[in-house]
Regions:
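Active-site acidic/histidine proton-transfer and metal-coordination neighborhood
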Residues: 52, 71, 75-173
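Residue-level detector of anion-binding/catalytic polar loops
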Residues: 30-31, 56, 98, 140, ...
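N-terminal pre-domain/capping segments
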Residues: 1-94, 169, 197, 248
Length: 250
């Protein structure tokens, strides 16, 4: 099987989109992953530029900052996060994309503000709402665990699967990012294998968040496992300079 490849443009923020798209296309990628800040884009221009370059939008990397918290104890804060996710679903539909990434808790939130049972309940309730809205506009969602140094909430694929299994959605799956997984999974390939057909999106980066081959992650068994489970989503490069805040470049 042949993989479909995409590139996350978060490091290109501030650069003219035509340059971003041309670069991604010239390097042979099939698709591009946009940054989850709708104000950065003119959707009609994005569609034209992508068509001119022969690429599509694979996905949107949603930006879960402190005010976008699906498990916050304040209902108004949770609603703000839901509204943001709906904006991203609309954006994805406008640009003809496939998958939006959903993380229940924002980057940098390192301790709970409510009992674990409550937070789990809010995560399930609110991801369900986001997923239903996404289905209505014709796009998919992918639940992403982050490593323990970026969030306390869910750090491994099996924890994301626990949430997914309690949802009533046909357009939802799991997102596996090899950078995060290298920190919190015992074995990346095994985690992908156990997730199986529930895996619908990936981010690829080496152990230092640089390009594969620049760190110490062994990608051969990882890619073989993706083939073995017939992964049909996009293999998306997310290469970010080392920083305590992964959104610092936006």
């Amino acid at each position: 099987m042949n993989f479909k490849y995409s590139y996350n443009t978060i490091v290109y923020t501030g650069e003219d989109y035509s340059i971003q798209a041309s670069r991604v296309a010239n390097y042979g990628y099939d698709a591009i992953e946009l940054v989850g800040e709708p104000d950065l884009y003119n959707f009609k221009e994005v569609n034209k530029i992508n068509a001119d370059n022969g690429i599509v939008v694979s996905s949107i990397c949603s930006i879960f900052t402190a005010k976008r918290d699906l498990v916050h104890p304040d209902k108004s804060e949770r609603q703000n996060a839901i509204d943001y996710c709906k904006q991203i679903a609309d954006m994805l539909a406008e640009v003809g994309g496939y998958t939006m990434i959903v993380a229940p808790s924002p980057v940098g939130k390192m301790y709970p503000l409510a009992p674990a049972e409550e937070e789990q309940k809010w995560a399930i309730e609110n991801i369900q709402k986001v997923g239903e809205y996404a289905a209505d506009v014709g796009v998919n969602i992918s639940i992403e665990p982050w490593n323990r140094y970026e969030t306390y909430f869910i750090n491994r694929l099996d924890q994301a699967v626990d949430i997914l299994d309690q949802l009533n959605l046909s357009n939802a799956g799991i997102h596996g990012d090899t950078f995060h997984m290298a920190i919190d999974e015992k074995n990346i390939a095994d985690a992908y294998k156990k997730t199986g057909s529930k895996l619908n999106h990936t981010h690829m980066a080496d152990s230092n968040r640089a390009a594969p081959g620049q760190g110490h992650t062994d990608f051969i068994p990882i890619l073989q496992t993706l083939k073995d489970i017939n992964f049909s989503g996009y293999v998306t490069m997310e290469l970010i300079p080392a920083a305590s805040d992964p959104f610092a470049c936006i």
